[in-house]
Amino acid sequence: MTAGQATRIGELLGVPVTSVRTAGAQHGYQHLTARLADGRQAFAKAAPGGDEATAEAFAAEANGLRWLAEAGAVPLPRVLGVSRDLLVIELLPDGRATQDAAEEFGAGLARMHAAGAASFGAPWPGYLASLPLDNTPGTEWGSWYAEQRLVPYLKKAHDDGALDDADLSLVETVVNRIGELAGPPEPPSRIHGDLWAGNVLWSGGRGWLIDPAAHGGHRETDLAMLALFGAPHLERIMRGYTGTAPLADGWRARVPLHQLHPLLVHACLFGGSYAAQVRAAARVLLTGS
């Protein structure tokens, strides 16, 4: 199996592969590490016999990595090659998160957000794990977020039985009140879009972004997701961020709003074990407690 994958990677990159190892799997993709004949090391996501959805997902991730890197604010691995069945990026050596690196990462994240986007959404179809994201451009964040980040996943989670009728009604109330909950208008920011702690790789004394669902979005979305799944040294990340780009008044009260989308996605992917968190986030938004 790995011999065939080594051949495919070598063909894609135009460089022979001297060794390849499996490195687990996630969302139906095989993870591989490879050493190239020119001395470079690479990480690959592989989907043997990839279909149209796989091709779109790999293209979206490659586009996102390149687009975020254009800001020159936070380091990202270089895209070495992308095809219908492979995404290959540079392999980064493992490091550890330090407080200073976390603060520097927060400042860089603020600068990346400030690089902006042409609109909310993106020119390419999006994916989050195995789920498609509608990146149709919009000009007003609240309605865009409600219609393209909340409603589709609320419906799927309910249809799949992960959320019950009461949960559906509760989140629909949030959607209907999005205008008052969304906060003051902000221009589209250049955001990662899936910024849980596992998508920050600490290497060489810096925080690197990997595996984005990049698009023009609200900058508070990335910060809320870092908080949702426990980023290391979060206080220092926030210090670096707010010291570079202060947040609008009331941002803490909006954290559950920005967390609703990833919670709904997790309910779609993993089932009803996330229903209580969806419910809690919606209730805090509607009642303040």
Predicted regions located by residue number:
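Hydrophobic packing residues in well-ordered alpha-helices of helical domains and bundles
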Residues: F58, A102-F105, D167, V171, ...
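Active-site Asp-x-Gly
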Residues: T139-A146, K155, E186-R190, A197-P256, ...
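ATP/Mg2+ or Mg2+-diphosphate-binding catalytic cores
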Residues: H266-S289
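ATP-binding pocket architecture of kinase catalytic cores
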Residues: T22-S143
